[in-house]
Each structure stands twice: as C-alpha cells, then as structure tokens.
Swiss-Prot record:
Organism of this sequence: Petunia sp. (Petunia)
Residues that bind chlorophyll b 4: 165, 176
Binding partners and assembly: The LHC complex consists of chlorophyll a-b binding proteins.
Binding site for chlorophyll b 3: 157, 173
Residues holding chlorophyll a 5: 213, 231
Transmembrane intervals: 100-120, 152-172, 220-240
Phylogenetic classification of the source organism: Eukaryota, Viridiplantae, Streptophyta, Embryophyta, Tracheophyta
Annotated protein name in UniProt: Chlorophyll a-b binding protein 13, chloroplastic
Role description: The light-harvesting complex (LHC) functions as a light receptor, it captures and delivers excitation energy to photosystems with which it is closely associated.
Cofactor remark from the record: Binds at least 14 chlorophylls (8 Chl-a and 6 Chl-b) and carotenoids such as lutein and neoxanthin.
GO biological process: photosynthesis, light harvesting
Alphabetized Pfam families for the sequence: Chloroa_b-bind (PF00504)
Amino acid sequence: MAAATMALSSSSFAGKAVNVPSSSEITRNGKVTMRKTVTKAKPVSSGSPWYGPDRVKYLGPFSGEAPSYLTGEFPGDYGWDTAGLSADPATFAKNRKLEVIHCRWTMLGALGCVFPELFARNGVKFGEAVWFKAGSQIFKEGGLDYLGNPSLVHAQSILAIWACQVVLMGAVEGYRVAGGPLGEVIDPLYPGGSFDPLGLADDPEAFAELEVKEIKNGRLAMFSMFGFFVQAIVTGKGPLENLADHLADPVNNNAWAFATNFVPGK
C-alpha cells in the first residue's frame, strides 16, 4: 500500500488521471472485480435523415412545422404530436421509455404468435399452435411443458408458470434497470454491455440508425398485435390461418366483409 502511494505521488504520474477502483469493486479476498460499463454514444452526425430539424416528417413535405419541443433529438420523432402528449418534458421522457419497452415486448410477442403456427404448418408438433389457445393447455391432462419438452418446466398450475415468469423476466429487467452481475448500468433504456454481446452499439452512427429501426419496427409490431387480437375475437383463428383464408378468397375474407357482419339489423 505504501509503495502504491509513493508511486502515485511521483513526478511520472503528475497531472495524469488514475483510475482507482471503488470500494464495491474490491472483494473481501482483496481482488479487484472489473465491472463492465457502458459509455454513452456520441451524437449522430447532422447528415442523418432521421435526426435534427431537417429529418423526415410524418407527411413528408406536407407535414408543416413540427412543435418546438420535438427537435429530432430522439429516434422515431417525426414531428407529429397533435394531442400535445410530449409537451411536458417529464411526461415525454416517461412515455418515450414506455414506448421503447412496449415495442420490444410486442416484437417478441408478434413472433411468438406467428412462429408456432408456422412451425405447425411445417410438421412440427405443438400441443396448441394458435397463440390465444395455447394457454388453455395448462388445464388439460398433462399440463403445459416449456418449449414442448417435459424434461424442462412441467406445469399444471398457473401459479407455477407465473413464478417462472417473475423469476426469469423480473431478474433480467432488474439487471437492466439497476445493474447487477451483468455489470453497471448507465442508461437503463439502452444498457449495452452484456446486453449487447455482438457490439452493435459500438459505432455511434450505426447505433443511431438501429434505434430508429427498433422504434419503427416496434410500432408496426404494436399495430400487428392489435390486429391479432381483433382477428382472434372476430374469426377465432390464428394470424397465419386468417392470411391463408384471405389469399384463398380475398373477396369474402377481408376486414370489410367481417365488419359488415356486425351491422345492426343484418
């Protein structure tokens, strides 16, 4: 310890910043644990079509002037806010986080609605491939197996499924927000580090474009999920079966045809 103090006080270290580990990084055994942190990305260049005052707007050249509080700083800002939901900075920050998180969940959810049905159509056996019917399998004999494998979590109880989801999803979300074994978190919305093993956010320009792609695809996924819900209520079929029916007979199997079935008096 004395040697280290003398080294730091020597002239060769004068004027230089020295990274000293915090107390949380020093274990009881005297070892230093390096915690992977995330650095914030540099601002995207002014040449990007998705950011800044000259960014792409929601109606292109016919959009008019965007509200003063929509400056094009964040991804997905097309200058449209007729309801004024983003006028308050605190509300805007909250809604922005909610939108990004919902985008991510709905993108996963949309895949979960489509792929089991797609696999079932190609010979892969499922207990129930239609997404809104799959949960009912837990009430049938044999219960519900995670990933269709009885050697994994075998549940005949909603509480067991709920507990698994709380542990698996809650732990990851907790690490994303507050850090933990995966490293210290600087930005909970874009934690990076161990949440970005491929290093997709290393380049600021590429990362800024990926943020735009994420929000655009996430918004489409939210509309898709809304469509899946409506289809399930109206037709009682999964999305791929509805698509196949529409392609086979587009005149009689479309949104307008089903909507007219609910006309009063018909």
